[in-house]
Amino acid sequence: MASKHRYYNRAHGYVAWDYAYNMLNSCEPNGIIFTNGDNDTFPLWYIQEVEGVRKDVRVVNLSLLNTPWYIKQLRDLRPTASEYNNLIQEREGNEIIGQRFIKIGDGDIKDITNGLTRWKTRDVTFPVQSDQQITWSVKPTFAKQALKVQDMMIMQIINDANWTSPIYFAVTVSPGNRIGLENYLEMEGLAY
């Protein structure tokens, strides 16, 4: 076993670090990037939390986005410094309440994560600026009859961000998980 040690030594393995660095630097300041799962999320979290790289980018793991605990964690995260500066300085006692990353209550989270949401293909419209909007078709993503929790939450996050943060999908996110937004996505580095 000791003779094979050199094959398993990761001392100079920079793939995960380089991947994370390049992925985060594909995003504009204060961006939100949706990642596919553990293998493409953990390197980003590591480089942000341990190395301090691009902590302004909010990383959202689509696999975990199907769980109530993760949705609550995202909702309750303290804002990044740049988000904090953009908050409406509303106070309740000594606490700044301003805006949250996700603006839904526990009851709404329970409703969304309680099961699949029956869905027929329909157009979804979000305002972009005061006089403009984007419209795209959202098709059922589960058994051609329902939306997954992550799909509902992608729409919720885009709506709640109110176009104050650029939205990205990692290159590892399959087209089926981009909720029909392909016509509005453009590849920039390792993100759409």
Predicted regions mapped to residue ranges:
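Phosphate- and divalent-cation-binding pockets in alpha/beta enzyme and binding domains
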Residues: 42-46
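ER/secretory pathway lumenal C-terminal domains and tails of membrane proteins involved
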Residues: 1-30, 47-192
